[in-house]
Amino acid sequence: MMKKVLKTCIKVIGFALMASLIMLFVCDRIVIRNAQGKTFSGIDSIKYNKVGLLLGTIPRTRIGNRPNSFFTYRIQAAVELYKAKKIDVILVSGAENGPNGFNEPECMKDSLIACGVPEEVIILDGKGYRTILSVINANRVFGLGSFTIISQQFHNERALYQAEHLGLNLNGVQAYNAQKPISRNIWIDVREYLARGRMFLDLLLYEVNSN
């Protein structure tokens, strides 16, 4: 009897796991397809937008306290856009009390200034604790109807989908892809798959709460 119950439990767990993996794969494909023609890696391909939305991260890794390449490359991308006159203002959105005690927007602001971006064109949003909040705040708090998202491509794809499916009054949102680190931990990919699955749940809950 116990063996039969155990077998049934294993089958149910296996089925649930397989269904979850399939669902995550489908979510990933939907996000990638939606971003086609809207994310750009070449500076000449990007259109002018007054504001660039720079998505926050910490300057040093949580483990090992090493320089965070994701941070460095996002700063470089934002500086490139500003110096190429593709944006006039940089809205830095992240957690003001991020991991390891870092204030993400302030850290990014300091790095942008060090790279020659004037302080007066940098706006901080310390309430961007998650990507979906950064997108919502850009529209609802800062009144932006269009902007250029700045992050790594996988992050941009998810942010674009959120921007277009939150029911916000947006037009002309695009994304500029920061360089991605050569050595990427596989956990980054796993986390992104999970984040894309969670994103659809977030969008559903946001829609329900908005009605």
Predicted regions and their residues:
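N-terminal type II signal-anchor transmembrane helix
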Residues: 2-44
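A structural signal for short, hydrophobic/glycine-enriched beta-strand patches
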Residues: 29-189
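Residue-level recognition of hydrophobic positions within alpha-helical transmembrane segments
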Residues: 7, 24, 70, 185-188, ...
